[in-house]
């Protein structure tokens, strides 16, 4: 469950390391879960990379510490809150995705992120 001012790890190689959520996209929404798009500001970044510190970016949430209930009754949760930076078309800005991602991303049409991920849970 991600809300304003929440810090997230970045799960790609775009150059950013930490994001802070400043807005959850959607009409009057307060919380974001796995597969939701947020507006975030880069709080920590590597030098000489495309994404710089204090850049305002779009990102899709790929992991949350808040447990996620599936229709089958299974409950999954991850060890951290993480996001992948995307462009306006919904494609990732990086070329690699680190760590596992949730299967719900495929239902939300983020198939490029799912195909780059090393593990889909």
Curated annotation (Swiss-Prot):
Alphabetical list of Gene3D superfamilies matching this protein: Ribosomal protein L14
Membrane-spanning parts: none
SMART domains cross-referenced by the UniProt entry: Ribosomal_L14 (SM01374)
Entries under InterPro entries matching the protein: Ribosomal_uL14 (IPR000218), Ribosomal_uL14_bac-type (IPR005745), Ribosomal_uL14_CS (IPR019972), Ribosomal_uL14_sf (IPR036853)
The UniProt record lists the keyword Ribonucleoprotein: yes
GO cellular component, one term: cytosolic large ribosomal subunit
One MF annotation (Gene Ontology) recorded for this entry: structural constituent of ribosome
Protein's UniProt name: Large ribosomal subunit protein uL14
Species annotation: Synechococcus elongatus (strain ATCC 33912 / PCC 7942 / FACHB-805)
Gene name of the record: rplN
